[in-house]
């Protein structure tokens, strides 16, 4: 392979990874480990970050593999339909990522094995069967965030000297389940026309954009409520920093969701895309709040600031091209209708 061909292939893989979503799920796993209040061995914390990240990457590869026929019609610029990434290569890369997840899970014991199996089943079930089946698909996808949090906790182990960590963990899992279900539903709003043409019976296709937006708002209210409960149940010494971070999260959520409400009758493609772009940053801040709840404000800021910056930079550099294709953003600005561009993030 020539140097140019190698660069082209590498770019196809990087596009498949969606770097603007990559930092989130590992931070969620790390947040779960922080909430456990167990022995914070560096290797355990690294595993709590690496295993969910490997599963996330595997999910992107397999999701693009299973969606290759739909993408050929609605997103031909993406790596597999454009021929820059062979479908078989994507399948093998997805399996390799799952193998890394399996290895780390086995090293962690039966708890992490169970969580990894559940996550792997959820990833495949969503991509292969559930994505086209309304709110059930969104709920399955949303559950993966909660499982990542649980995996991180099981990596370190719950301390018997701190039984109060269990209700905090459960409330936090509910918050991430509701949040990731909500953000996935915003993704479905972006692609109503493409999903309808491809036979995907998503919630916006079945019930329309106004109903889907109301569902998004209800799920976000559930997210904030569960996250607030988690903070009120946690150690009072770190509650102030957590609640301050949660206020930032709510402010970002308002910035993301207000345009959806304003345009719910006819959703322009860029409104939905920008809403999801803000949510991608907002959820990193949300995950960092739980890191701060367990480890303190110093480690939280040390992780959150560069991850938010990397997420924002990667979106500016890559997202419009990956979602809309070269030359399509200007077209999207000029039309009120949607271009097909949903992904699993």
List each language-model region with its residue ranges.
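Multi-pass alpha-helical membrane architecture of UbiA-family
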Residues: 1-345
């Amino acid at each position: 392979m020539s140097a140019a061909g190698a660069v082209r292939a590498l770019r196809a893989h990087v596009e498949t990874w969606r770097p603007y979503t990559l930092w989130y799920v590992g931070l969620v796993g790390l947040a779960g480990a922080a909430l456990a209040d167990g022995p914070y061995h560096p290797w355990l914390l690294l595993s709590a970050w690496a295993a969910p990240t490997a599963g996330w990457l595997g999910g992107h590869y397999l999701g693009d593999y299973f969606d290759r026929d739909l993408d050929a019609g609605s997103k031909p610029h993406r790596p597999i339909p454009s021929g820059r990434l062979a479908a078989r290569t994507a399948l093998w890369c997805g399996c390799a990522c799952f193998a890394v997840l399996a290895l780390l899970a086995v090293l962690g014991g039966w708890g992490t094995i169970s969580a990894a199996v559940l996550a792997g089943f959820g990833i495949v079930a969503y991509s292969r069967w559930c994505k086209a089946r309304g709110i059930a698909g969104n709920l399955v996808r949303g559950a993966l965030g909660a499982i990542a949090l649980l995996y991180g906790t099981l990596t370190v182990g719950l301390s018997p000297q701190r039984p109060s960590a269990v209700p905090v963990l459960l409330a936090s899992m509910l918050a991430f389940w509701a949040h990731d279900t909500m953000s996935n539903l915003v993704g479905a709003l972006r692609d109503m026309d493409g999903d309808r043409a491809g036979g995907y019976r998503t919630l916006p296709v079945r019930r329309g954009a106004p109903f889907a937006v109301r569902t998004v708002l209800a799920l976000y209210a559930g997210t904030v409520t569960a996250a607030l409960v988690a903070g009120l149940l946690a150690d009072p010494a770190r509650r102030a920093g957590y609640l301050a971070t949660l206020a930032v999260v709510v402010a970002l959520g308002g910035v993301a969701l207000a345009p959806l409400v304003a345009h719910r009758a006819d959703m322009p493609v860029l409104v939905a895309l920008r809403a999801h772009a803000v949510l991608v940053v907002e959820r990193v801040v949300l995950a960092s709040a739980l890191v701060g709840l367990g480890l303190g404000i110093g480690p939280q800021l040390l992780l959150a600031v560069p991850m938010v910056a990397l997420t924002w930079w990667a979106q500016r550099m890559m997202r419009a091209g990956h979602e809309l294709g070269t030359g399509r953003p200007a077209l999207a600005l000029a039309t009120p209708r949607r271009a097909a561009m949903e992904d699993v993030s």
